[in-house]
């Protein structure tokens, strides 16, 4: 797919199962309203005019995606994902064409706001390394004693942020950092951690705390509430 330097490709790793949801259906295929969580997440990306192409990495044995309208969307490419998130992202990057910048967004994070996305995308004008949406930690944080559910000490929350998605980086830089980190056995929990491993310092762009990831059963009702409220606000 041809792109310009202003166009962005989004990669959505959707090969996971999400056992903490305690359902037989992978969480990205659970429904909120008349759409799956995955559809909500992808449509939020495509709503921005700079996002011209979305690559979705699914499990090789996935039979559910083909049943969605997304399967026939002209701006969407599907690739086989890997066992780990980083493997799926790398597979997505290989299908990202010549886009200079890429977004990586959780398949199960359906409540992305357009103003947050716009501020994140603006980093391509000011940064060479990109950045992530994140929310400052507001709760008191406790460190547990090793191997015990007992408090070791309170962690200073000043300067602590919850990492969110999307995360936004130059495509080649992200590819090189992910590849190096995996080859060297580094623990990669998100895309920013791969850049950190390679000595880069991505920017933090404050995003809304209601941009939640559906991970546990109780998150589904909360995401439905946030989405319903957002749709109501947009229509009034």
UniProtKB/Swiss-Prot annotation:
Its EC number is 2.7.7.60. The record marks 157, 213 as: Positions MEP for the nucleophilic attack. One of its GO terms (biological process) is isopentenyl diphosphate biosynthetic process, methylerythritol 4-phosphate pathway. SUPFAM superfamilies: Nucleotide-diphospho-sugar transferases. One of its GO terms (molecular function) is 2-C-methyl-D-erythritol 4-phosphate cytidylyltransferase activity. CDD domains: CDP-ME_synthetase. Pathway: Isoprenoid biosynthesis; isopentenyl diphosphate biosynthesis via DXP pathway; isopentenyl diphosphate from 1-deoxy-D-xylulose 5-phosphate: step 2/6. Keywords: Isoprene biosynthesis, Nucleotidyltransferase, Transferase. InterPro entries: IspD (IPR001228), IspD/TarI (IPR034683), IspD/TarI_cytidylyltransf_bact (IPR050088), ISPD_synthase_CS (IPR018294), Nucleotide-diphossugar_trans (IPR029044). The record marks 20, 27 as: Transition state stabilizer. It catalyses: 2-C-methyl-D-erythritol 4-phosphate + CTP + H(+) = 4-CDP-2-C-methyl-D-erythritol + diphosphate. Catalyzes the formation of 4-diphosphocytidyl-2-C-methyl-D-erythritol from CTP and 2-C-methyl-D-erythritol 4-phosphate (MEP). HAMAP family: IspD. NCBIfam families: ispD (TIGR00453). Homodimer. Belongs to the IspD/TarI cytidylyltransferase family. IspD subfamily. This is 2-C-methyl-D-erythritol 4-phosphate cytidylyltransferase. It comes from Escherichia coli O7:K1 (strain IAI39 / ExPEC). The gene is ispD.
